[in-house]
Amino acid sequence: MPLLISPFAELDLIRQPEQQDEPLQAFDAADEYLLNHVAETGLSLQSRVLVLNDSFGALAASLASHATVVSSTDSFLAAQGLEKNLARNGMSYDAVPHIPASEPLSGPFDWVLIRVPKTLALLEEQLIRLQGQLAPGARVVAAAMVKHLPRSAGDLLEEYVGPVQASLAVKKARLLFATPQPMEVRTSPYPTRYRLDEPAIELLNHANVFCRDGLDIGTRAFLPYLPKNLGTARVADLGCGNGVLAIASALDNPQAHYTLVDESFMAVQSAAENWRATLGERVVEVRAADGLDTQEPDSLDVVLCNPPFHQQQVVGDFLAWRMFLQARAALVNGGALYIVGNRHLGYHTKLSRLFRGVEQVAATPKFVILKARK
């Protein structure tokens, strides 16, 4: 893989999760453009720099030796990537503190460097949280590849920071410069809430939760076919989002024990709050993690999963395949993985390579619900 070469450092970077023969690099031209701009403008060792949505630490690791840098993302994998890439390039793994996007920031910051996220609600929430966190004369610069830069990103910067000027495109990347202005303090529109009829629950969703304004159609197809009569089974909701699958299952299985896992800190925050609102003090484990990567082998009886098919702007089934492998390792012999997936993704064939038996539980014109037994 090529090195990220900037005026600040030459770095050998890896993506997360790691894959053999990884076809994609851990940085892009928008990272390079942003680093070059910071170097041309000038950065002092005393500067406090906040980096938002740095996918694998390309920006934060480049600047770590040149200023006081703090990174904030909504991704456990991004936080893990930052640590690994710092260590991989001869720095302490904790040289740059990482603050989950679900937690408050602590300024003042002289620079705010933003990689525009796929979910603009996350950007909006991050900009709202910047209120009162900027030092006098602070510089706020957002970067993206042109094909992933909607006009509304600039509109949000203008609404919450100040006037915006766009750069020329360089290597198909563009920068947005926002000049901070005094603003009326704004209240966040997040979290959002919606109600379900079956089960009759209300769900809260922080800004970066998938389908935060209503139940996604895959989950809606899955809910009627969640397993019942689980007794004291140990159940994991893998990629839990707002926790709806686990909560619905727990209502039907009052003695079962649940673990909810997602790589999004805001998803985990939403799931924990929804569990408490619906199930009170019933014991549960909710954690941000790389799926079931750290789950003890043979420690689960059932895994529920509505697998994602994209990581930011990268689309593919590599995350689903990884989840299936993790589920197989964590399940006891005879345990079962239940999933919902689009018909065209061919999950039945993939699961048949990993599990002893795969059966179709139900189907709709668009989705299939599958049960794979270890």
Curated annotation (Swiss-Prot):
UniProt cross-references to Pfam families, sorted A to Z: MTS
Primary location: cytoplasm
Compartment(s) where it occurs, according to its Swiss-Prot or TrEMBL record: Cytoplasm
EC numbers, comma separated: 2.1.1.174
Enzyme class: transferase
Gene Ontology MF annotations: 23S rRNA (guanine(1835)-N(2))-methyltransferase activity; nucleic acid binding
Chemical reaction(s) catalysed: guanosine(1835) in 23S rRNA + S-adenosyl-L-methionine = N(2)-methylguanosine(1835) in 23S rRNA + S-adenosyl-L-homocysteine + H(+)
UniProt entry keywords in alphabetical sequence: Cytoplasm, Methyltransferase, rRNA processing, S-adenosyl-L-methionine, Transferase
Record carries keyword Transferase: yes
Cellular component GO terms, alphabetical: cytoplasm
PANTHER family: RIBOSOMAL RNA LARGE SUBUNIT METHYLTRANSFERASE G (PTHR47816:SF5), RIBOSOMAL RNA SMALL SUBUNIT METHYLTRANSFERASE C (PTHR47816)
HAMAP family: 23SrRNA_methyltr_G (MF_01859)
Main function: Specifically methylates the guanine in position 1835 (m2G1835) of 23S rRNA.
Family per record: Belongs to the methyltransferase superfamily. RlmG family.
Name of the protein in question: Ribosomal RNA large subunit methyltransferase G
Native organism: Pseudomonas savastanoi pv. phaseolicola (Pseudomonas syringae pv. phaseolicola)
Lineage of the species this protein comes from: Bacteria, Pseudomonadati, Pseudomonadota, Gammaproteobacteria, Pseudomonadales
